[in-house]
Amino acid sequence: MANGFSTSPRRPILHHSPRFNLGSSSRLFCESTPIFIGTIPLHCPKGTCPPAQSHGHSSLRTNLNSSPPRCPQNPGTEPSLQPLGKVLQCGLSRGLHETLKVLQTPREELPLQISSQLPTSPSRLQSVPTSQHKPAYREAILHPRLPDVFYAAPNLRFVRKLPKPSQSVRQPRRSSRKLNDRLVSKPRSVSVLNPQVDSPLHTRRALSRQLQSARQRPRLAENLCDPNSIPEPVRVRPGILGPSPFPSYREELSNTKSRFSEDKGSDFLPNPPSSNSSEPGLPGRPSQAPSCASENLRRPLHLHSSNPNSPHFRSRWIRKNSVKQARVQLGHISSLGQSPNLRPLDSLLQASRVLHATSVSSYKTQGASHEECFKTRSDGITSSHSGHLHHNDRVEHQLQQGPLLQCSQDSLAEPTYRPGTPSLPNFCIAAKELSSTQPS
């Protein structure tokens, strides 16, 4: 048995009908190498079958066109075996013929048309409107089963071309670290208004070169005729010992206003011109200046108010009232802003101390004499009466000397006292109280 075909005549051979099973035939010949490739005519004579013109394997051709066996058949064999072999070969070839016919059916060669020979459609010849920048074709109209249909090329006439710059951004053969200060394109001349002229294009920022800050210069003089130019009082400024215990700012403001009105009514003089006599110990009062000269007068700001050459101001620490003047008991005379012309008044202070000591000693002696007078009878009464009269004489003598020691209320310069020393007005008041409390 070669290639699956039996050659022994003794084995029964089954007759295959023309309805040969394609599956069985394919199983028999699938193991062999290329089967019949050549064409076999469809019509074949009944008795004979032409040899297969195949280009396949040589053993397959010999088996299909096999010669009769070497040993002759016995005379007892049926003569019908020979035609059965032929029928088998024809039936086998028929099955193969039908199979090869299906597999090797030549395709009808369709003449392919070149793209230039395609029928022109009216939609392709339409011009693209200038308002549209998209291509004229639409993908939704094309059919997916027509591979021979190509997309229409867009019309490049309506595509804008960018102008090439005259100069590149970076020059060739140049270091990248160096900045390129050259412009990409040449500057165009633009008509711009003059920025120096007032125009809407002019910037509103101030020019620092034209505007310069003025130098700060101190004021050397002030107009005294202006009521608003009232100098700051010296008492407001804290001295070496701190701010002085004076009345509140409202009272001082009212005092300054009243003083300014008085000075204005008297042509900027501290006192009326009737009192031309000067008190002892004070500088002479300058002569009155005319009104026209006082209006044009200019006084430097840094002039001290206690300077004797200043005609319009006097020391702030001097009071017209002696009671208020006695309350100034802080610091030395020089530290309180007093004028050096008031320093000779220290002799008056020493006299006040002597009077105070004598008054205290006399008061003690008179108290002892009064106790002795109460122990005695008539003699004690007369002695107490005489002692009381003697005490009254001393008080009257002190009261007579009091106005001489203390300055009058109308005087300009009233003395100030150091801390720890009694003032002259207080001493006089104490003497009056002692005289009033003594039994008559």
UniProtKB/Swiss-Prot annotation:
Query: Per its UniProt entry, which superkingdom is the organism in?
Result: Viruses
Query: Which residues fall in a compositionally biased region of kind Low complexity?
Result: 274-284
Give the residue spans that cross the bilayer. Answer: none
UniProt xrefs under Pfam families:
Tymo_45kd_70kd (PF03251)
Specify where the region named Disordered lies, as residue ranges: 49-81, 162-295
Biased-composition ranges for Polar residues? 55-80
UniProt feature, compositional bias: Basic and acidic residues? 249-266
Q: Which family does the similarity line name? A: Belongs to the tymoviridae protein p69 family.
Q: What is this protein called?
A: Uncharacterized 48 kDa protein
Lineage in the entry? Viruses, Riboviria, Orthornavirae, Kitrinoviricota, Alsuviricetes
